[in-house]
Amino acid sequence: RDTLLINLEKATTCTDPDEKQALLNIVVVGGGATGVEVSGALSEMKRFVLPKDYPDLGNFHMNIYLIEGSSKLLGAMSPEASSNAKRFLEDMGVNIILQKRVVDYKDGDVFLDDGQTIPTRTLLWVSGVKAVHFDHIEGELLTRGERIIVNECNQVKGLSNIFAIGDVCWMAEPDYPNGHPQVAQVAIQQGELLAENLQRIEALKK
């Protein structure tokens, strides 16, 4: 946030048009829940804060780019949620780039795998969350990003007395066939449910 505000202040006094625009370009990498949320918040800022607090920017505009390597946003959610998020962000003026990957960020330029470059001084990386690796939990117990496969009770696949919650786990359900999004609210809900289940397990032992 501080970096973004500093860049906006720089843009108001910058006399080089190319540098001025680079200061106003924001690139968000990762079209998951966090990337969509951040892009939405930035678009609100673009619409309601900039005209009021930074009138000196004149004809220059903040450009928000959301880059996702797969074919859709919110890959862990339903097709309807993905489509709605894309339409909402596009209506808010976000430039969505799908099926492209960032291969480098050098000298203030973002380089994509198709050769496209985007000059920016603000790069927000919210892609590629990888779970912490645990010894002896390997192979068929893991899925993409080394997330641990669990059932609806957060039990690790095939292990009745080991549980996993939050970013580290992968639980497939009809509404989330690719696992739940790796956000705080999911971890909180799983933690509360697991606490209740562990209490029930202990009660049954007595």
Each model region followed by its residue ranges:
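Glycine-rich dinucleotide-binding loop and its adjacent helix/turn
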Residues: 1-34, 41-48
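FAD-site-proximal beta/loop scaffold in flavoenzymes
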Residues: 1-17, 109, 117-196
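Active-site flanking residues adjacent to catalytic metal/cofactor-binding acidic residues
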Residues: 36, 67, 165-166
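A Rossmann-like FAD-binding core segment of flavoenzymes
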Residues: 43-152, 156-158
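Internal hydrophobic alpha-helix adjacent to the cofactor/substrate pocket in enzyme cavities
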Residues: 44-47, 185-206
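Short helix-terminating capping/connector loops at secondary-structure junctions
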Residues: 16-22, 53-61, 206
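Cofactor-binding loop segments of dinucleotide-utilizing enzymes, especially the Rossmann-like FAD-
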Residues: 31, 69, 167
